[in-house]
């Protein structure tokens, strides 16, 4: 069994489970006598190698990847930690040729036989292009709280993010009930509503708005939100929970980074209008306090759930197995309850096409069982 030199990096937004992947790769590789080099801060690490900031030995990961003092020495905690011990950056495609050349030079200096890339759709697109230029052998591992990477049912980090948002909705329910408030929660999801939909159902939301069904907040959708809230009021509920994805646009079809606040204002104004011209029942909504909150980067943090640790671990192990078999340019995926792998090229083609057309590469299925589940519960999803 020959020694191999492989690299591993994390790229794009962080999420729970990244360190569990790193741990699995390092431990499995160590048992084979391989050397694993941790590239700091995505492809920027290659630039720093090219510029002499790091030598190869500086990046060599040990069996545990870190050192702990005293009685903690040898304690294996990496799988429990959120974030990335390697660091991560979201910078887009290298715009200057000199930067791309430095990345390729840094990779060549390290003399790697393969590179494991833990990233989302954007990162995989960028690094695939670099790999083609540099003739790299790469294995991709999908990670994203958006769960929008094609071909895989789940990406590392998604399950924990759903749990974090669900817990937030649970906690907010009680303050909403105590003060008879309508609380609108803004959830991450640039183009995809998987996180918002899953957490909204699990967290007991009354209205869930995602870009696949509600690309923009039309006046009709806002009125329907008011009707949903009025019906809750008539049933005896004096509070409500609305979850909206950051990917939903405003009434002018413009992206609004404060879309929850925007929706709160629109519901207030529309309720007043309906009260004045149509039905006095809407006047009851006006008395309700409407508050908006954005969970932000809390969704990327937190201790990974056991399932995300398991998913990250089996993904890391499969990546090492593929390198051992010299099966390159693959993406490790989770499909129908088991780990598999697929050619990376067609996935990148889908990602590129969708990015050019401003579409999500793996959107929520409007006719899927999760959407049907929400509708069966009486949750309003923003249909006109």
Curated annotation (Swiss-Prot):
Mg(2+) binds at residue 121. It catalyses: beta-D-fructose 6-phosphate + ATP = beta-D-fructose 1,6-bisphosphate + ADP + H(+). GO terms for molecular function: 6-phosphofructokinase activity; ATP binding; diphosphate-fructose-6-phosphate 1-phosphotransferase activity; metal ion binding. It holds the Pfam family PFK. The keyword Transmembrane helix does not apply. GO terms for cellular component: cytoplasm. NCBIfam families: PRK03202.1. Its cofactor is Mg(2+). The lineage of its organism: Bacteria, Bacillati, Cyanobacteriota, Cyanophyceae, Synechococcales. This is ATP-dependent 6-phosphofructokinase 2. Its EC number is 2.7.1.11. Keywords: ATP-binding, Cytoplasm, Glycolysis, Kinase, Magnesium, Metal-binding, Nucleotide-binding, Transferase. It comes from Synechocystis sp. (strain ATCC 27184 / PCC 6803 / Kazusa). GO terms for biological process: fructose 6-phosphate metabolic process. The record marks 122 as: Important for substrate specificity. Catalyzes the phosphorylation of D-fructose 6-phosphate to fructose 1,6-bisphosphate by ATP, the first committing step of glycolysis. Pathway: Carbohydrate degradation; glycolysis; D-glyceraldehyde 3-phosphate and glycerone phosphate from D-glucose: step 3/4. The active site is at 146 (proton acceptor). It comes from the Bacteria. Substrate binds at residues 144-146, 181, 188-190, 246, 291, 297-300. Belongs to the phosphofructokinase type A (PFKA) family. Mixed-substrate PFK group III subfamily. Its main location: cytoplasm. ATP binds at residues 13, 91-92, 120-123. It is found in: Cytoplasm. HAMAP family: Phosphofructokinase_III. Homodimer or homotetramer. The keyword Amino-acid biosynthesis does not apply.
């Amino acid at each position: 069994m020959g020694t191999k030199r492989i690299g591993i990096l994390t790229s794009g937004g962080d999420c729970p489970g990244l360190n569990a992947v790193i741990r699995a790769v390092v431990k499995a590789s160590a048992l084979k006598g391989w050397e694993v080099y941790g590239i700091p801060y995505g492809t920027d690490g290659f630039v720093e190698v090219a510029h002499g900031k790091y030598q190869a030995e500086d990046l060599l990961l040990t069996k545990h990847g870190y050192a702990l003092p005293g009685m903690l020495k040898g304690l294996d905690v990496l799988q429990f930690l959120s974030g990335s011990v390697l660091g991560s950056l979201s910078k887009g495609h290298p715009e200057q040729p000199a930067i791309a050349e430095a990345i390729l030079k840094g990779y060549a200096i390290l003399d790697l036989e393969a590179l494991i890339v833990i990233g989302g759709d954007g990162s995989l697109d960028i690094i695939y292009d670099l790999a083609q230029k540099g003739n790299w052998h790469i294995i991709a591992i999908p990670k994203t709280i958006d769960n929008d990477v094609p071909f895989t049912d789940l990406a590392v980090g998604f399950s924990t993010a759903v749990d974090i948002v669900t817990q937030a909705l649970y906690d907010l329910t009680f303050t909403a009930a105590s003060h008879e408030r309508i609380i609108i929660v803004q959830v991450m999801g640039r183009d995809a509503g998987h996180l918002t939909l899953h957490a909204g159902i699990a967290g007991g939301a009354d209205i869930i708005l995602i870009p696949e069904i509600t690309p923009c907040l039309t006046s009709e959708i806002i009125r329907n939100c008011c009707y949903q809230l009025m019906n809750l009021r008539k049933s005896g509920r004096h509070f409500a929970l609305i979850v909206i994805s950051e990917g939903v646009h405003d009434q002018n079809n413009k992206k609004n980074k404060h879309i929850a606040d925007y929706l709160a204002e629109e519901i207030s104004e529309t309720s007043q209008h309906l009260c004045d011209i149509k039905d006095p029942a809407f006047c009851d909504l006006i008395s309700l306090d409407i508050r908006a909150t954005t969970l932000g980067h809390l969704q990327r943090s937190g201790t990974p759930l056991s399932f995300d640790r398991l998913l990250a671990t089996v993904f890391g192990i499969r990546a090492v197995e593929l390198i051992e078999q010299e099966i390159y340019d693959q993406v490790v995926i989770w499909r129908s309850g088991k780990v598999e792998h697929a050619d990376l090229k067609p996935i990148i083609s889908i990602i590129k096409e969708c990015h050019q057309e401003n579409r999500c590469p793996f959107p929520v299925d409007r006719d899927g069982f999760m959407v049907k589940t929400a509708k069966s519960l009486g949750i309003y999803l923003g249909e006109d």
